[in-house]
């Protein structure tokens, strides 16, 4: 599972004791605060006697008080995790700062969590961020061209219905859209209307969130979850569940 804008409040204490389940730091300075979203989820999963490996990294300051970050939870043992900038801006106080989080597992697959900027942003556009991401993945041999079994997941801020922009760029780089490959699928809509960043027009619904695969897999189903129909609404973006053989 990949989570974006997985936040903690900057003024909360840092956890000093051991973290639940299998915590994998994404760098030498990795730490979490007591109200960290990923930490709360890890504690809940542990209470349900589930076993997961998890990692988290902070990326930027949101709304003046939240450290908005990225998280990955894996049922497969994670052997290592790291995070890296994909934006030209690297200022924690600038809300346009963007990072990626990567987790590699013991038996091969790598999982990546990202929160991309907008295609037409004059300061931090999608194309530049995607190019930096691809460069970092090339160094780690995690691109489709590297033969990697990678899964690239997150909020891409790129409506699937718009041609010639973010989604098409990712496709051109060799990634496969699991929604399109799915044998069973729903509408795919992950944002039902206007939210922050998309208030310049009326939007009846957009598919902004994706699970991309580096290799061709048999995708049995792609389903929108946490949308009030399949699970409660938890965010202004719904979740995406892919069943992959």
Q: Where does each model-flagged region fall?
A:
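An N-terminally biased module of ancient metal coordination in phosphate/nucleic-acid-related enzymes
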Residues: 1
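Active-site neighborhood of divalent metal-dependent phosphoester/pyrophosphate hydrolases
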Residues: 4-32
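Active-site regions of metal-assisted phosphoester/phosphodiester hydrolases
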Residues: 23, 33, 46-47, 51-245
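FAD-dependent flavoprotein oxygenase/oxidase catalytic domain
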Residues: 28-33, 37, 43
């Amino acid at each position: 599972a990949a989570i974006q804008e997985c936040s903690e409040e900057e003024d909360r204490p840092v956890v000093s004791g051991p973290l639940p389940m299998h915590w994998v730091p994404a760098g030498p300075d990795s730490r979490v605060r007591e109200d960290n979203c990923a930490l709360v989820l890890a504690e809940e999963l542990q209470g349900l006697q589930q076993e997961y490996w998890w990692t988290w990294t902070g990326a930027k300051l949101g709304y003046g008080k939240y450290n908005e970050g990225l998280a990955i939870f894996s049922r497969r043992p994670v052997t290592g995790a790291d995070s890296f900038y994909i934006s030209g801006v690297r200022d924690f106080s600038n809300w346009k700062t963007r990072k990626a989080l990567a987790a590699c597992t013991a038996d091969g697959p790598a999982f990546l969590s990202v929160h991309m900027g907008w295609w037409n942003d004059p300061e931090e556009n999608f194309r530049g961020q995607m190019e930096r991401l691809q460069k970092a993945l090339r160094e780690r041999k995690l691109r489709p061209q590297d033969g990697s079994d990678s899964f690239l997941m997150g909020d891409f801020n790129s409506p699937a219905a718009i041609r010639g922009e973010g989604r098409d760029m990712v496709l051109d780089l060799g990634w496969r859209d699991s929604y399109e490959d799915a044998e069973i699928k729903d509408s795919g809509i992950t944002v039902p209307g206007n939210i922050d960043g998309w208030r310049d027009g009326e939007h009846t619904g957009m598919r902004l969130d994706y699970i991309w695969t580096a290799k061709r897999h048999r995708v049995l189903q792609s389903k929108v979850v946490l949308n009030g129909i399949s699970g409660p609404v938890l965010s202004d973006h719904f979740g995406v569940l892919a069943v992959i053989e």
